């Protein structure tokens, strides 16, 4: 009998990677492994995805963990460096960086580096989060071209705000803005992340940046467009065990606050997982889990270490039986729809006490 465990399927990760190759056959792939590879384990996932052309991370610490773990392929800091003191570290470890601000540009201009750094100028085409505004972009670009600490040519990237919405006109506007700026320039281009890869093939360019789809999760909220619609397989199964099976009478409440009351005699199961493991405390009664091949609903409030589920009056489930919170047979997208929490957040917020197990052949 096991407590909360995240089982990561190497075969699913590799399958998804090859599916993405089919979606963007003329682009190279930046495997986005930030945030502990979306909860799948940073270094292990990078090793599984050893056919990636580059790895994308958010923080310099993530990049250094990859390097210390033996990863030698290019690594790109998607948010860029945070201070001038990071620059020698980037040089020493051959790490590429996004550049999106005047402060970063000045740090590059003023640094004394042993060799130039490969940079990606980030253009704000409409996300309005990071990036150089279009009206300032040409002057910014000229300074990057003139900077001896910048390896030439300068490369270009941006990020869509609504790529997971196929009917949104914003993506076309952003792409047109990007194209207007990069036209006639020689650097590599990257603008498509997961949504762009699936829905906007005209955005694929030199490199694409798969994130959530690499882990077998759809970026779209519509459950009819979950990962299996695109031939993707869930790489993570979050599971635990029944630690108690109890008779429960009609009219009896369960859990903190007595928020759920049984309408009939039934059998309740107690599962060893809770918000202390990263399972969402906000999951309402009715959120499904999978036990012995059937969905059963959570009842009552999620506790720190446990949830209760209504097994049904005739249930034959026993202590020790496996319980799947999400994975094959119960897509995380469905749990996300029930809880009101995005699938991105569900898979990345698991806590350190959740055990990690990897299945499938190693590379």
Curated annotation (Swiss-Prot):
| Sequence positions bearing N6-(pyridoxal phosphate)lysine | 34
- Class of enzymatic activity (EC top level): isomerase
Binding positions for substrate? 129, 304
| Keyword vocabulary terms for this entry | Isomerase, Pyridoxal phosphate
User: Which reaction is recorded as catalysed by this protein?
Assistant: L-alanine = D-alanine
What GO cellular component term, any one, is given?
A: cytosol
User: Which pathway does the protein contribute to?
Assistant: Amino-acid biosynthesis; D-alanine biosynthesis; D-alanine from L-alanine: step 1/1
**Recorded E.C. number(s)?**
5.1.1.1
Q: Which residues form the active site?
A: 34 (proton acceptor), 256 (proton acceptor)
Q: Which GO terms describe its biological process?
A: D-alanine biosynthetic process
List the InterPro entries.
Ala_racemase, Ala_racemase/Decarboxylase_C, Ala_racemase_C, Ala_racemase_N, Ala_racemase_pyridoxalP-BS, PLP-binding_barrel
Q: Which cofactor does it need?
A: pyridoxal 5'-phosphate
Pfam families on file: Ala_racemase_C, Ala_racemase_N
Citing just one GO molecular function, the answer is:
alanine racemase activity
Q: Which family is this sequence assigned to?
A: Belongs to the alanine racemase family.
List the NCBIfam families hit by this protein, alphabetically: alr (TIGR00492)
Biological function: Catalyzes the interconversion of L-alanine and D-alanine. May also act on other amino acids.
Q: What is this protein called?
A: Alanine racemase
Q: Which organism is it from?
A: Edwardsiella ictaluri (strain 93-146)
Lineage in the entry?
Bacteria, Pseudomonadati, Pseudomonadota, Gammaproteobacteria, Enterobacterales
Query: Source gene?
Result: alr
